Amino acid sequence: MPEIVLVGRSNVGKSSLIRAITRGAADVRVGKRPGVTRKPVFHELDGELVLVDMPGFGFMSGVPRRYQERVKDLIVRYLEEKDNILFAIHVVDAKALPEIAERWERRGEIPIDREMFQFLNEVGLDPIVAANKIDKIKPIEFEEHMDAVAEALGLFPPWRQWLDTLFPISAKTGEGLVEFLEALQERVRKAGYPEFARFFRTK
């Protein structure tokens, strides 16, 4: 069965996003503690398409670093080996990402979200980025902040030149979801499954 995978660090709102785009049709467990989803969770839509909620990579509350590395390896292996994935949705915390990326860069390391975004492109999963939690960004700072989000992912600002890839949304308030759903419709059509567009209706 064709799949769309959702990947992202722990606690960025992957499960909340699935609940929002399926209008609650998918039975989703949403938790505040990082690392609530610890193995792939499969949400079948009409027995035709599967949304796969991958475990969050990176920090997990109360979980040894060794286990966190195992989870990351599981995600990479899954994405490399599956041949039925249409594309990936890379969910990031738009509010927190620039600061987190800066911390990684200060340590001389590649930010984990940039690494994942590049990996998704390398394995041909044509990622679409859901920059979630924009309700936490002050309107006056929005443009500058989204430029920083783009930069954190390795995309040259201004962010608006990436409107087919980078979507500011709030799974909580619904802001930006119409544009995001329209992009999902376009992606499934492009993948050769126009009939799946009905799963991402805007009304």
Swiss-Prot record:
Database matches in SUPFAM superfamilies: P-loop containing nucleoside triphosphate hydrolases
Q: Could you tell me which CDD domains the record lists for this protein?
A: YihA_EngB
Instruction: Please name the GO terms that the record assigns under molecular function.
Output: GTP binding; metal ion binding
What Pfam families does the annotation carry? MMR_HSR1
Q: Which cofactor does it need?
A: Mg(2+)
Give the top-rank taxon of the lineage listed in the UniProt record for this protein: Archaea
What keyword terms does UniProt attach to this protein?
A: Cell cycle, Cell division, GTP-binding, Magnesium, Metal-binding, Nucleotide-binding, Septation
Q: Does the keyword Iron-sulfur apply?
A: no
Q: Name one GO biological process term.
A: cell division
Point out the signal peptide segment: none
Domain EngB-type G residues, every copy: 1-190
- Where, in this chain's numbering, is GTP bound? 8-15, 35-39, 53-56, 132-135, 169-171
Binding-site positions, Mg(2+): S15, T37
- According to its UniProt entry, what is the function of this protein? Necessary for normal cell division and for the maintenance of normal septation.
| Recorded family membership | Belongs to the TRAFAC class TrmE-Era-EngA-EngB-Septin-like GTPase superfamily. EngB GTPase family.
Q: What is this protein called?
A: Probable GTP-binding protein EngB
The protein's organism comes out as Methanopyrus kandleri (strain AV19 / DSM 6324 / JCM 9639 / NBRC 100938)
